[in-house]
């Protein structure tokens, strides 16, 4: 695995259980113990063994990996080596099994022969693709998943107990430094609440952050990565000319841009070519899921067959289900020949716009949804990507406003227990304005989990190449934590994040954040905003001038609170200064856009150029979905 520059921050305040740390004689141990007793997010206590993993900053242990390690097994071992050295000063050698003395003491990472001999062999049924086992046997310890992705995740869990390791952002990683460390008596099986967990935003451009947050790259889950609306790449209308008599019936009559809006999923000839082309793309696939992706628009085919299906089932989804069942049947046959000894490839299709409604009926007697007929039940290996793009994300899916969303989810769960979910946590029209999903995130995640969701993609602003304004770093952290363990206390997660990420300015920044959460609730509950991703929130009736000015004055207080670092730690000061400045961006954007007339021409021009300078310094590159921030400079009349 190619290594990237790592920016580390030493622990500012230890808040985790003292049982996870042995041999660190300082006040933070006691303080951490007291604080932990008051918290809900408490880790299990793991007793120490008699064995010294590190003593006086040195170790007799080494890290054992398989003779032929996978990329992720090697990466996991390197991460373990790195952070143990950072925390203790001891650099454990990494040794392949064919080169190592397995009679010595070791930390085994991945599918080693030693782990098999020790009986550490987690099955898929036990830990799925992302879970793992941590097991101490005598003076050795085994870190192992069913997959190497699970093994990668196991290292961060192990570190969290051994040295209180935690990551809040790519440049905010904390741990407790100690020169003496006992080996802990691990006997844990860890399975995430959601098997596959993904976002975009920072994780698009920083693989290392994704791994350390125990998230998944899209490419780890889905064959085509982020190319999810991919039907026209499988049956290309320029190759199979949609204007010709031979192929025109393969596509919908409606045109979007310069090509058909959708494929005609009831056309059997098209389906055979689709299957033939798709199977070619499966060769050598690393991911185990392929998305049968409709195009990204609201249109659907209205040919006689498709229209008749909609008339019968009340939704266009029935045509898609029958098409996808046939594709999955063909993929299953292909798996038997081409995926022997490997995880079989499964398909998912979109429940999105025209296909979001499941073909089900409601049985009042049983209080459950049922398929209209057996032909619309998804076969075992087929799944659905439930993407409620028209939902309100200001309220949970269980509220009256989102009654249709909950009904749709329950309906799909009546057809399959293999649901992948795509939810939305950003504004398409104004990327720079806070999208507050903190109030509903946990409840929505739990509802999805309770109804068969095994994969979740909670979409944020994927085009922004750096952490976004509008509290996006806090959002990314909490999303990561709740996807892994949906039972965690959100307030404690936020308190922990702010205390580390904003350091001495934590209290003020948290106050600004919570005030904006309340203000956003006012916008949604009292002023009529729907909470949808396409909302236009850049309206004067939503934002009062006094509120914006008050928030900006609070940021000045936060800048003052980090002055303690200006001379003593200039690098930390710069880091905190930029983090605070990033959060000012959305307020300044709204103020300039809506209340520019409150200032003289000269004052407004200076405000715009100061904004531009900070935005460029921070690396912000877009301000709306698909719209470069350079367009904003043009609109503002600045260069």
Locate predicted features.
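Substrate-binding cleft/loops of secretory-pathway carbohydrate-active enzymes
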Residues: 347-388, 432-437, 467-475
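Catalytic domains of carbohydrate-active enzymes that cleave complex glycans
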Residues: 481-639
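C-terminal motif of bacterial Sec signal peptides marking the signal peptidase cleavage site
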Residues: 19-23
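Feature activates predominantly on carbohydrate-active enzymes
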Residues: 68-71, 76-79, 83, 124-314, ...
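Bacterial N-terminal signal peptides that target proteins for export
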Residues: 1-11
